[in-house]
Swiss-Prot record:
<keyword id="KW-0489">Methyltransferase</keyword>
<dbReference type="GO" id="GO:0016645">
    <property type="term" value="F:oxidoreductase activity, acting on the CH-NH group of donors"/>
</dbReference>
<keyword id="KW-0949">S-adenosyl-L-methionine</keyword>
<keyword id="KW-0963">Cytoplasm</keyword>
<dbReference type="InterPro" id="IPR029063">
    <property type="entry name" value="SAM-dependent_MTases_sf"/>
</dbReference>
<dbReference type="InterPro" id="IPR036188">
    <property type="entry name" value="FAD/NAD-bd_sf"/>
</dbReference>
<protein>
    <recommendedName>
        <fullName>tRNA 5-methylaminomethyl-2-thiouridine biosynthesis bifunctional protein MnmC</fullName>
        <ecNumber>2.1.1.61</ecNumber>
        <ecNumber>1.5.-.-</ecNumber>
    </recommendedName>
</protein>
<keyword id="KW-0274">FAD</keyword>
<dbReference type="InterPro" id="IPR047785">
    <property type="entry name" value="tRNA_MNMC2"/>
</dbReference>
<comment type="similarity">
    <text>In the N-terminal section; belongs to the methyltransferase superfamily. tRNA (mnm(5)s(2)U34)-methyltransferase family.</text>
</comment>
<keyword id="KW-0808">Transferase</keyword>
<dbReference type="Pfam" id="PF01266">
    <property type="entry name" value="DAO"/>
</dbReference>
<dbReference type="GO" id="GO:0032259">
    <property type="term" value="P:methylation"/>
</dbReference>
<dbReference type="GO" id="GO:0002097">
    <property type="term" value="P:tRNA wobble base modification"/>
</dbReference>
<comment type="function">
    <text>Catalyzes the last two steps in the biosynthesis of 5-methylaminomethyl-2-thiouridine (mnm(5)s(2)U) at the wobble position (U34) in tRNA. Catalyzes the FAD-dependent demodification of cmnm(5)s(2)U34 to nm(5)s(2)U34, followed by the transfer of a methyl group from S-adenosyl-L-methionine to nm(5)s(2)U34, to form mnm(5)s(2)U34.</text>
</comment>
<comment type="similarity">
    <text>In the C-terminal section; belongs to the DAO family.</text>
</comment>
<keyword id="KW-0560">Oxidoreductase</keyword>
Length: 654
């Protein structure tokens, strides 16, 4: 289980500097936080000169604190007309400030400067204080702040990125020795680009020894505000210090991509690539986007909570929070889509389950902005109908129109998107020039590009030619209830099934779960099952009061992997793995040969709304060589090659 986040306590000294009572040290020099950031970290890493005319530039910071280093760097990037196209700032923080405290601390530091407006932007975007990686975007996505909340000893080895510069800015080594330990510098060495630099205000002997042992060359330069010396330097290992190289951008001649499948997964990928300047061809076998499972009238979105905070729970939390950020960005850009705004309730199915739910929230220290426990009376008042048990309220959860969201994502791509509808891709082939060809059943080329993303659910593995990607097609039938026939709940509720109020007074409920059933027709038995489930969820509803045969509904099909997690990322090269099978029996995922330029985004099951945006961002980051938007452990849990590596270890690849 991941450790809960303990926020920092905001304390000001008489001279106005921010101090940590936990560590007994100041966050910045009394001579000025912004001046210190400029002298030590920006100039200490030869910025802005080193980021000029680059596509991306990545800075890694140990200790976010008040955010003044990020704010100063962002301001310097804005002021430089030759800045890199995309600036990535990745910062690790064990004790982040709560939003209001961060706003107060940062506003105090930058008062009466041109940086003041940036503080509001940062504070407004500040995430819930939950463990893990949080990605925030500013200046239309050209500046990205990736926050990693947790102990640096645990977090740094779990990051996937290639760093161009390091800001080493923890509290003094005498106050917080862990952040200056050899283990920290070894982790940084595994992230460093071959030309990476670093800067730090300290010049202690222990830090110099740890830097040297990790492969960093250092030199003393004049310190800040009368301090005699500080350290700067570069990554210059005299021996091999890492087994695997940090991720690089995909080497392509032309920045164009094919996305197969115009559902939630595919349209999210289109938007993320187009935002980075890629030209994308979207191929959909139907005439319209979101015609399969993504065409449901509404879908619910919420994170999972598990007492042990397992992989699925962490992934759903990361996906949920990332999706909210992406949707807000779309709305801010003027793209509209219907989504509810008053939260979502998850109801327990028994008194024992309610106690487990309550204990889970308390044990994990879940922030109230993410979820909070509701008593039976509170839940009943919120839903305005009788219920049997309490549960959770997800204040930011709710329902959304998947088709409208997909349309907004395509609209955001603008003229970087080309669509091919009513055409089915039968297979993929790599041309002699290394580009991918999408072929129809006759072998004719539909489109070609440097990159292909298969996002067509249960057909993805077949189109990509994968043998080791076990997915299952699961039929789901939902039911539409006419106005006045069900309790008029004001917000979505889930538990044993779900109920969603639609704008026209119709109530949506469902859905059945029928593996390996390809029937596309509505069935009375399916409606009856949904009605009985709704009766258990909302006892005031009578399943027998309606004629199930006369009800409207819809049938869709989920794509579910054997381990119930999605398949997202670069696909394995199964042919190459078969040739080297004997050497790969003890391999790790990073050792598996990959089909360069071929990616997957499928197997989302019933959680496409929660996982699609994060999956698209992960693929875009992998293609561009950017910091990944989630921990490596989580990325490996959804890596499409995980099934291939399992087969290799069992000697089942030939």
């Amino acid at each position: 289980m991941t450790d809960r986040i303990v926020p920092a306590t905001l304390v000001f000294r008489e001279d106005g500097t921010v101090v940590s009572p936990l560590y007994g040290d100041i966050y910045h020099s009394a001579a000025g936080a912004l001046a210190q950031a400029d002298h030590v970290f920006i100039r200490g890493n030869d910025l802005p000169e080193r980021w000029r005319h680059k596509r991306t530039f990545t800075i890694v910071e140990t200790g976010f604190g008040t955010g003044c280093n990020f704010l100063a760097t962002w301001a310097a990037w804005r002021a430089d007309p030759s800045h890199c196209e995309r600036l990535h700032f990745v910062s690790v923080e064990k004790h982040p400030f709560a939003r209001d405290d961060l706003r107060r601390a940062a506003a105090h530091i930058v008062a009466y400067t041109t940086i003041e407006p940036l503080v509001d932007a940062l504070a407004n975007a500040w995430p819930a204080l939950t463990p893990g990686v949080h990605r925030l975007e500013f200046d239309e996505g050209r500046v990205t702040l990736t926050l990693a909340f947790g102990d640096a000893l645990d977090v740094l080895p779990n990051l996937a990125l290639r760093a161009d510069a390091f800001y080493l800015d923890g509290f003094a080594p005498s106050k917080n020795a862990d952040l200056w330990s050899p283990a920290i510098f070894k982790s940084l060495a595994k992230l460093a680009d071959e030309h990476a630099t670093f800067a730090t205000y300290t010049s202690s002997g222990a830090v110099k020894r740890a830097l040297d042992e990790a492969g960093f060359a250092y030199r003393k330069v004049e310190g800040f505000a009368g301090k005699r010396a500080m350290l700067v330097g570069e990554f210059a290992p005299r021996w091999r210090v890492r087994r695997h190289e940090p991720p690089r951008a995909l080497d392509v001649g032309t920045r164009d991509a094919i996305v197969i499948g115009a559902g939630l997964a595919g349209c999210a990928a289109v938007e993320r690539l187009a935002a980075r300047g890629w030209h994308v061809t979207l191929i959909e076998r139907r005439e319209r986007i979101a015609s399969e499972a993504s065409g449901n009238p509404a879908g619910v979105f919420h994170p999972m909570i598990a007492r042990d905070d397992n992989l699925a729970a962490r992934l759903s939390r990361a996906g949920f929070l990332h999706a909210l950020n992406r949707w807000r960005a779309l709305e801010h850009a003027g793209h509209t889509f219907a989504r509810s705004a008053h939260g979502l309730v998850q109801l327990a199915t028994s008194a024992d389950e309610f106690e487990l739910m309550r204990e889970s929230v308390d044990t994990l220290g879940v922030p109230s902005e993410l979820a909070r426990t509701l008593s039976r009376d509170d839940a009943q008042a919120l839903l305005r109908t009788d219920i049997a048990h309490g549960g959770w309220l997800f204040p930011q959860g709710g329902s959304i129109s998947p088709a409208a969201l997909a349309a907004a994502q395509c609209a955001a791509a603008g003229d970087r998107l080309s669509r091919i509808a009513g055409v089915e891709v039968a297979r993929l082939e790599r041309g002699g020039d290394g580009r991918w060809l999408a072929l129809d059943a006759s072998g004719a080329t539909i489109a070609q590009a440097s990159v292909v993303i298969v996002a067509n659910a249960a057909d993805a593995a077949r189109v990509a030619g994968l043998r080791h990607a076990p997915t299952q097609r699961v039929r789901g039938q939902l039911t539409l209830l006419p106005p006045g026939s069900a309790p008029a709940v004001p917000l979505p509720a889930i538990g044993d099934g779900y109920v969603v109020p639609l704008a026209n007074g119709v109530t949506l409920t469902g859905a059945t779960y029928e593996p390996d059933d390809a029937d596309t027709t509505l069935r009375e038995a399916g409606h009856r099952e949904n009605l009985e489930r709704l009766e258990r969820l909302l006892p005031a509803f009578s399943a027998h009061a309606l004629d199930a045969h006369a009800l409207a509904g819809r049938v869709g099909f989920r794509c579910v992997a054997s381990d119930r997690l999605p398949l997202v990322g670069e696909l394995g090269d199964e042919a190459a793995a078969a040739r080297d099978a004997a050497a790969l029996t003890g391999a790790r995922l990073r050792d598996v040969p990959r089909a360069a330029g071929l990616y997957g985004a499928f197997g989302y099951g019933s959680r496409g709304l929660v996982w699609a945006a994060l999956g698209a961002e992960l693929i875009a980051a992998q293609i561009e060589g950017e910091p990944w938007p989630l921990e490596r452990e989580l990325a490996e849990a959804i890596d499409p090659a995980r099934f291939l590596i399992r087969a290799l270890r069992r000697g089942r690849v030939a």
